[in-house]
Amino acid sequence: MSKVENKTKKLRVFEAFAGIGAQRKALEKVRKDEYEIVGLAEWYVPAIVMYQAIHNNFHTKLEYKSVSREEMIDYLENKTLSWNSKNPVSNGYWKRKKDDELKIIYNAIKLSEKEGNIFDIRDLYKRTLKNIDLLTYSFPCQDLSQQGIQKGMKRGSGTRSGLLWEIERALDSTEKNDLPKYLLMENVGALLHKKNEEELNQWKQKLESLGYQNSIEVLNAADFGSSQARRRVFMISTLNEFVELPKGDKKPKSIKKVLNKIVSEKDILNNLLKYNLTEFKKTKSNINKASLIGYSKFNSEGYVYDPEFTGPTLTASGANSRIKIKDGSNIRKMNSDETFLYIGFDSQDGKRVNEIEFLTENQKIFVCGNSISVEVLEAIIDKIGG
């Protein structure tokens, strides 16, 4: 199929539910300088800090050094921000932060706002979508996924997954001639379950009424050269044109390709050595795994993976946020440095994030588990944008 945009034209992109900017990372790899982030929506502070570290290396050259503590607190208190990705921070929250941490956060939020972060997705309708070529929206999966409580995504439901309809609200507030040419959605496979069928069909029909043609597929990151078997639903919606999503045909990498060659002592799970392992068995997804006998009543919590094969889906929480790997006679965990590589970021990205000392291991793995395979995004962006 012919490519539908000329790469010499800058692709103007808005990242809704931006996370750590997997879309931006893919754009950087595919289009080099031929793209522009014209705005984003993200309210989870650790993700914003990591986004700015990865894409702008902001913490090595703080732009706002001489701002008083009172001014920083006043600024942050007037933004809709979250520290847990679920709820806004409480009154007085920023006053409890130490000066060094507060300064890093303040700089990250200021720079993010400078790049067009609206923070609260519910404000997207107030911002014109004019002069945006590509709007990406990987809306929250918590109310859809098997890991979550499956409240669904009905319009007006008040669920986090129901924030999808803020995209509809923004499109409705935009003149038809000013609509973005491309809309790119990503979410978990449960989006296609019968429980969510009615809402997904409503959404597709809404887009069709605006002139979009939809291509929707389940794509596996392993088919695009990732070390991870990560199946996610993608939909590309194009104004007055059909663009087919790419079919992955690359050989997956093994888990060991993203693992540090020297294993840190803190990553070795000595407490598991007392458990015997079942025989390793290979799945259809090229995952080779065994189980710790008697370790947990939850099967996935006891899985141990062979590093010579493809790995499982990394999740933000639950058993698959704690991936266990056989390492000779030991069992080790996948650490946060490795999860950045596992989702398709570069080694320098994890190093930059590690330079910010207040970010925890759990927060780093959480954002990677919530992110999108950069390898899949590269293939999609190459097809629609070049």
Swiss-Prot record:
E.C. number? 2.1.1.37
One function term, GO molecular function aspect: DNA (cytosine-5-)-methyltransferase activity
Keywords recorded for this protein, A-Z? DNA-binding, Methyltransferase, Restriction system, S-adenosyl-L-methionine, Transferase
Q: Which reaction does it catalyse?
A: a 2'-deoxycytidine in DNA + S-adenosyl-L-methionine = a 5-methyl-2'-deoxycytidine in DNA + S-adenosyl-L-homocysteine + H(+)
List this protein's GO terms for biological process. DNA restriction-modification system; methylation
- Show where the SAM-dependent MTase C5-type domain sits: 11-386
Keyword Methyltransferase annotated? yes
Q: Pfam families annotated for this entry?
A: DNA_methylase
Q: What residues form the catalytic site here?
A: 141
Q: What function is annotated for this protein?
A: This de novo methylase acts completely and exclusively on CG residues in DNA; methylates unmethylated and hemi-methylated DNA.
What family does the entry list?
A: Belongs to the class I-like SAM-binding methyltransferase superfamily. C5-methyltransferase family.
What is this protein's name?
Orphan methyltransferase M.SssI
What species does this protein belong to? Spiroplasma monobiae (strain ATCC 33825 / MQ-1)
Q: Which gene encodes it?
A: sssIM
